């Protein structure tokens, strides 16, 4: 279980490291414009608490590795900037089920800690 470090985003900015166990990552996504940091990291057991870091989504995804890209599904209309891409760690997925006959089709990804995420159909390779 390798640990990797990122710069935690604070308001106001402060130099600090966030060291994460890559085996504990559920998914990552680019931070919304109204949040601090460039990337948001969701970890096992944290519920709605997230970790915002200053590094770009591309760097975070490449550092963690073995993530599967999917488009997030929103029950409400997507944000003005469009639907976000989430990068999911398949090792921490309990199961994936379709939410049919909903239109547009989407999948519910259930993680081993009981949290869930909805992604747009079709389901990406690797899940």
Where do the PLM segments sit?
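Acidic, Ser/Thr- and proline-rich intrinsically disordered linker/docking segments
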Residues: 1-127
